[in-house]
C-alpha cells in the first residue's frame, strides 16, 4: 500500500485488482480516472497539489490473504487484523475507484478477498429489526471494468449485479461503471479503450468540484 501525502480535502481510495498489476487494462484506466480526478481538485495556484490525498491498494503487488477461521476468531476476540486497516481506508475515502477485470464472468479472487475483509457487522454495515443497513454512505464509487468480450447488459454479465449488490449492502449506492469491452476481439480493442477513456472524461467533467 502506498500513500501520497497531501492534505485531506478529498481522499481517493484506488484499488487495483488485475493479475497483471499496473499493466492491466483496468489498472491503467482506473489510474487514468484517478489522475483526472486529482487534476480536477488541484489548486491551480499551487506548485504541488495539496487538495487530494490518494491511497492506493494494488492487490497483485501486495496480495491480501483470503478470510480464514483464524482471522474470524481474532475479530471475535478483539485482536487487530488486516481488515481493520482496510476498513479505515474505506471509511476515510471520499471517492473510491475500483479497477475490476472480468475473470471467468466474475471478479478477481484478490478483490473478493478485499471484499470479505471490509464487510464487517458493526463497522461497514449493521443488522436491524428490518434487515441489514449499510454504514458507508455519502461516498462516490467508480468501477472500471475490463472484459475480453461484450457482456454489458447481457445475461453473461453476472459481475456488475454482484458488485451493485455488495457495494449497496455497505451503503455504497452512488456507483458509476466504466466499461472497456471487446479487448480480446480482433479489431475491437482500440475502440473499447477509446470508449472507456471517453466515458472517464465525461464523468470527471460531471463530478462536482
Curated annotation (Swiss-Prot):
Cofactor note: Binds 1 FMN per subunit.
Single GO MF descriptor: oxidoreductase activity, acting on NAD(P)H, quinone or similar compound as acceptor
EC top class named in words: oxidoreductase
Catalysis performed (reactions): 2 a quinone + NADH + H(+) = 2 a 1,4-benzosemiquinone + NAD(+); N,N-dimethyl-1,4-phenylenediamine + anthranilate + 2 NAD(+) = 2-(4-dimethylaminophenyl)diazenylbenzoate + 2 NADH + 2 H(+)
Gene3D superfamilies xref list: 3.40.50.360
Cofactor: FMN
Residues that bind FMN: 18, 102-105, 146-149
InterPro entries: Flavodoxin_fold, Flavoprotein-like_sf, FMN-dep_NADH:Q_OxRdtase_AzoR1, NADH:quinone_OxRdtase_FMN_depd
Keywords: Flavoprotein, FMN, NAD, Oxidoreductase
Enzyme Commission code: 1.6.5.-, 1.7.1.17
Keyword DNA-binding attached: no
Known function: Quinone reductase that provides resistance to thiol-specific stress caused by electrophilic quinones. Also exhibits azoreductase activity. Catalyzes the reductive cleavage of the azo bond in aromatic azo compounds to the corresponding amines.
Family per similarity comment: Belongs to the azoreductase type 1 family.
Known partners and oligomeric status: Homodimer.
Full protein name: FMN-dependent NADH:quinone oxidoreductase
Source organism of the structure: Saccharophagus degradans (strain 2-40 / ATCC 43961 / DSM 17024)
